Design a protein with these regions (language model features):
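Surface-exposed, glycine- and small/polar-enriched segments that build interaction surfaces at terminal
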Residues: 138-154, 172-180
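Right-handed parallel beta-helix/beta-solenoid
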Residues: 32-69, 86, 105
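Acidic glycine-/aspartate-rich tracts in secreted/extracellular proteins
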Residues: 1, 20-22, 49-55, 78, ...
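All-beta strand scaffolds that present successive hydrophobic residues in beta-strands
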Residues: 12-15, 82, 100-103, 130-136, ...
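Right-handed parallel beta-helix/beta-spiral solenoid domain characteristic of secreted/periplasmic
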Residues: 99-149
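Intrinsic low-complexity, repeat-rich intrinsically disordered segments enriched
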Residues: 1-42, 175
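Short, T/G/N/S-enriched strand-turn elements that build extracellular solenoid repeat scaffolds
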Residues: 5-7, 35-37, 67-75, 87-96, ...
Length: 180
């Protein structure tokens, strides 16, 4: 979690803490008052084939339609939970720092690219992110442009707490293309 130190008008620092447990916080000439250092779980954003991207997606009975919309809503500590189904998404799907993308189960969630994005990377990962329990399929690796990977790290990739995790994911490409 990120904690802002100071008031809105006089914010002088931001700190990232995880799993902090303390009875006493001792500092030199700093007064910390009313700070909650208890790490709380983030929000869950739900995605389903019958969802609606105009909805907030914060309840299992009111999901968004696209994974991209779920990712746009999510922030550090949040989870994008994907119900079973076949999803067609514009690749790449950008996973923000600290966000978990979790499919219902490995074979029940299938993600394929929309027309025109088949040679793009499927997922671009930031630090501390996770993708798990899903299948990515029907895209091409393009050896000429070096694109079309299942997973790639973002250009400005940084690790704060841990590196990205990719677990229980099946990647099925349609083959390889060559371009200049």
């Amino acid at each position: 979690n990120t904690y802002n130190i100071g008031t809105d008008a006089k914010r002088w620092a931001t700190g990232n803490f995880a799993n902090v447990t303390t009875n006493t916080l001792t500092t030199n000439d700093l007064d910390f008052g009313n700070i909650n250092l208890i790490s709380t779980p983030g929000n869950i954003y739900y995605v389903a084939t019958n969802g609606n991207d105009a909805r907030p997606g914060e309840h299992p009975q009111d999901p968004v339609r696209t994974i991209a919309q779920g990712l746009s809503l999510a922030g550090v500590g949040d989870t994008v939970y994907i119900y079973p189904g076949q999803y067609q998404e514009a690749f790449p799907l950008n996973v923000p720092m600290g966000v978990t993308v979790k499919g219902h189960s490995l074979r029940s969630v299938e993600i394929s690219p929309t027309s025109g994005t088949q040679s793009n990377d499927a997922f671009v990962m930031q630090g501390d992110s996770t993708v798990e329990d899903l299948t990515v399929k029907d895209f091409f690796y393009n050896s000429g442009s070096n694109t079309g990977y299942g997973f790639r790290f973002a250009n400005n990739f940084r690790v704060y707490l841990r590196s990205p995790y990719i677990r229980n994911v099946t990647v099925i490409t349609k083959g390889t293309t060559t371009s200049n």
